């Protein structure tokens, strides 16, 4: 990638590692923010860099738009069935990244308990010099996996499963969480992320 700038490399590495598609807005916010905070400038830069990366055959650009935006990806094109879900996953990651969090590591579809539970997003994040492990479920058509996460938390509390930092659970869904013993441990925001501040407030002390 000799003609790529550092931000191109980070963008490309993210796509390769997560296999998530991204809209140009999320690409711009996460990888090409304007120093002045001008969103239009940021998007223009991101569009130019994406065209260059496409020419160098590092990324692909969708032939047709999702809503009003093209999306960008590497490898196999996302299926129509999974596209909205996977775009929302990348949107969640981008939103977290742009709200004062340092994303140290990110994995998608991470399995726990010998495959009994598969988390949509696993991240190690840092906020105000404190690191956390974040498990995020993005649910568009099904309720939050209360049973699976109850088992996981029970094992964590017993010391059978260990995380390197404090564990945070995030649900992104428009379906209400069912009443359960673990409900108090879960922060839920809507799929448009209008209520994202509910998540952010957990870290503001």
Q: Where do the PLM segments sit?
A:
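Nuclease-adjacent, charged terminal/linker segments that flank catalytic cores
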Residues: 1-77
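Short, amphipathic alpha-helical interaction segments positioned at domain boundaries
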Residues: 75-99
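Catalytic cores of nucleic-acid endonucleases
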Residues: 138-188
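Charged, structured surface patches that assemble and position nucleic-acid processing machinery
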Residues: 183-205
